[in-house]
Amino acid sequence: MGRRYFGTDGIRGTVGEAPITPDFVLRLGYAAGKVLAGTADVAAGARPTVLIGKDTRVSGYMLEAALEAGFSAAGVDVMLAGPMPTPGVAYLTRALRLSAGVVISASHNPYQDNGIKFFSADGNKLPDETEAAIEAWLDKPLECASSDRLGKARRLEDAAGRYIEFCKSTFPAAYDLRGLKLVIDCAHGAAYQIAPHVFHELGADVIPIGVAPNGFNINDGVGATAPDALVRAVRANHADLGIALDGDADRLQVVDSTGRLYNGDELLYVLVKDRIATAGKVDGAVGTLMTNLAVEVALQREGVPFVRAAVGDRYVLEQLRERGWQLGAEGSGHILSLDRHSTGDGIVSALLVLAALKRSDRTLAQMLDGVTLFPQKLINVRMKPGADWKGSASIRAAIDAAEGALAGSGRVLIRASGTEPVLRVMVEAQQAADATRHAEAIADAVRMATS
């Protein structure tokens, strides 16, 4: 039986609508707490402890309180990190030997949305069977622990400082960032008090933008999903590079001094090239079904095996672990380097890119010389929840027409979002006009069939 609440990246939705309501989130905290309590060494008097971090959405206060109450009712202690990037929660959970970590965030979504995602004790996303166990507990009545067994809550002192030091530790000690002018766009999100300090303390001249959250402006015209603001700031300040994070700082986009934008596909290639130069070889790299074909071809040219996972960083992570590889990425900017961190981390990924540039004494454009991305057109089509797009003859006909016209010179990918009622239509072709024309034709068919 499929999961009812957990999607590809936890539980997410519009605040005030099921399941992102305070009563559900309280029960979710209780259910997760009972699952954790079942794995703790209760006989030895152990009490599970979880860490809760959040981004800057106004709803985070409400959901944090609900989660805290649910965990306490289950007899689980809580540590509160306050605003903290998703990868920061993963790191602190592992470093402090806690039972689990919880992030309250909807990542790159607007402030009206929010979500809950969990990390296991080792800083990894929960396995499917644990999520299923939590869902099973949601069906049971909430039976509050006795007063002497209620969980306690306290704030984690200097959570930001601990994570800042971890990020800096991933940058080679032989290098620093002196002489570099960097624009850092924090998307008015979880990294607003962290990312500028990381790069500044490594020596960079930092120009921060997107660092004035008010509860309502997260990802609004700034950050990795709206890089135009970063491009303008880089040009206006004559900066060497711009770094854009999203609301929970697990994804990255980079802009060079000319205003050229580099996505996760290109940055993966840069990191692979750097590893080849420093380690002599790379066993393999993982992308997704959306990864640009040009990057796959370029990696093959370097003798690096390449595997496409389903879209979603959890699936990239699964493929990396299965093969014992270290480097993987999505074009959206989720970059994984498993010898540095257990999950995607925008700040750490940016430091890896900067280290590669320092070691090679080359620019991003120079490192990507000879890699020309195939034009891609991506259209997100909102549809009614539960719409049967797979059974639509008109959508199938539009896809067949596009694939027939491209005839081996491009590809079509249609997939449903795992976090919202959206169908993503992607067409890749040798000519941008062809990609746009075919993507729009398919998107029109989707709108007609699912609206």
UniProtKB/Swiss-Prot annotation:
Family: Belongs to the phosphohexose mutase family.
Reactions mediated catalytically: alpha-D-glucosamine 1-phosphate = D-glucosamine 6-phosphate
Ligand binding (Mg(2+)): 107, 246, 248, 250
Domain of life: Bacteria
Active site: 107
Gene3D superfamilies per UniProt: Alpha-D-Glucose-1,6-Bisphosphate, subunit A, domain 3, Alpha-D-phosphohexomutase, C-terminal domain
Phosphoserine PTM sites in chain numbering: 107
UniProt keyword Coiled coil present: no
One cellular component term from this protein's GO annotations in UniProt: cytosol
Lineage, top ranks: Bacteria, Pseudomonadati, Pseudomonadota, Betaproteobacteria, Burkholderiales
Function text: Catalyzes the conversion of glucosamine-6-phosphate to glucosamine-1-phosphate.
Keywords attached to this entry: Isomerase, Magnesium, Metal-binding, Phosphoprotein
Cofactor: Mg(2+)
EC number in record: 5.4.2.10
SUPFAM superfamilies tied to this protein: Phosphoglucomutase, C-terminal domain, Phosphoglucomutase, first 3 domains
GO terms for biological process, alphabetical: carbohydrate metabolic process; peptidoglycan biosynthetic process; UDP-N-acetylglucosamine biosynthetic process
MF terms (GO), sorted A to Z: magnesium ion binding; phosphoglucosamine mutase activity; phosphomannomutase activity
Cofactor binding note from Swiss-Prot or TrEMBL: Binds 1 Mg(2+) ion per subunit.
Maturation and modification: Activated by phosphorylation.
The protein's name in its UniProt record: Phosphoglucosamine mutase
Disulphide bridges: none
Keyword Phosphoprotein: yes
PANTHER family (UniProt xref): PHOSPHOGLUCOMUTASE (ALPHA-D-GLUCOSE-1,6-BISPHOSPHATE-DEPENDENT) (PTHR42946:SF1), PHOSPHOHEXOSE MUTASE (PTHR42946)
Species of provenance: Burkholderia ambifaria (strain ATCC BAA-244 / DSM 16087 / CCUG 44356 / LMG 19182 / AMMD) (Burkholderia cepacia (strain AMMD))
